[in-house]
């Protein structure tokens, strides 16, 4: 073979390889990324504002270069009562549904007001089942007016309903908040419940209500498989195993404060009555879980109802044979299918959420988050659906194993970003939905410096993702599900601010389209906007509207 022939064949090989690469690139999908910065609200005042205090070169550049605006993420705009701050469940459901969703909390409160709550079949039957077997009624849930996981009005109504339907003994196991409420505010809620109980006991001579235990939500409401925490709550409620004994719930709270525990972290405490024995859940008792939000109720619920071959969280010394176990709402398919459980309020069915509609159009989608927010970009974003859609891929990145996230403010954001950038570059996905948990999870600690570090870690990740989207010729929307870390001090209580806010959240378009962000938007407008970026008409079920309009 001559040199000329060899050169010719080499050129042909290179051209063939280049052609193959071009064909491969042509087959790559144009990525549309929805980036949800959890707990990242907009607040004009820079004081005690972790976002304003952070060094954010990437986000600052994005704000300078791309269209942006603000959208509503709280109150009636997301299906909550007027003035109620948003939360991650509500936010992600509105983001994925493309319509305002009236929340379980609103629905249940409406039934309490109309007294239909007192006729709820699952709740009434649970009380009657315990009565028939000579058992007691136990009510457990987050005692708070935070409105994120529970509502104290519902717990008080359940105490009343149990007596109305003939319960002899009603015991309340209180999970204390300090996360969606000020860190040391439990006295307010305990005293309110105590006053309600006094009135009920005075009116219904045939039955009585009593607070049986208190414990911080850190233990009772884990969602990250920290079973050692859940075990403490389970053993408190079933065995009376506690760090403290008290004759009064308010006294127990004060004892915890003296031990430098805030509400969220209050150790297991038994509140004993005149007979000086714990009031525990036993055989033939009914147990009613009054949290309406699923993600932080599942683990404890599983401990009460799953058989040994399905439950591996911890060894259960006592497994009461319950007369009934009621979930206020559907916590999971597994729990709903369990013959020992019933559901007071079933979810309303949703059709043509963003995920379902993308499936119907033959599109591919990725959902990615670390453990703390994985349920939000999957279950909640899909309108309460557990299963993947056809063409959907899910990536779960483990959250760091630390006691509180101020100890590792970056959490697993860098690892989430690694996998997200890889997915964008792969060209396999039409739509990629990512949640970054830092702003919310570190914001909840109330530690300002850690929240600033969390935002700065996010900024690095945002820059990397924006570069990948640009290189792939795609589009990205950056938004949030609710506010949090933009306010780290509570000026009313004088304590650190650990709960969410009612602030608007950013909506930033990153891409090459000549558009601007219209005013008056809300979270339910995001899904139709994603579809508009793909030149796909939104389904009729999506009442939200495109947030992007032609630039003037």
From Swiss-Prot:
Pfam families for the chain: iPGM_N, Metalloenzyme
Reactions it catalyzes: (2R)-2-phosphoglycerate = (2R)-3-phosphoglycerate
Region listing for Disordered, in residue ranges: 1-30
Taxonomic source organism: Psychrobacter arcticus (strain DSM 17307 / VKM B-2377 / 273-4)
Pathway noted in the entry: Carbohydrate degradation; glycolysis; pyruvate from D-glyceraldehyde 3-phosphate: step 3/5
Biological processes annotated in GO: glucose catabolic process; glycolytic process
The name this protein goes by in its record: 2,3-bisphosphoglycerate-independent phosphoglycerate mutase
Keyword field: Glycolysis, Isomerase, Manganese, Metal-binding
Quaternary structure and partners: Monomer.
HAMAP family, per database record: GpmI
Gene Ontology MF annotations: manganese ion binding; phosphoglycerate mutase activity
Enzyme Commission code: 5.4.2.12
Family membership noted in the UniProt record: Belongs to the BPG-independent phosphoglycerate mutase family.
Polar residues biased stretches: 1-25
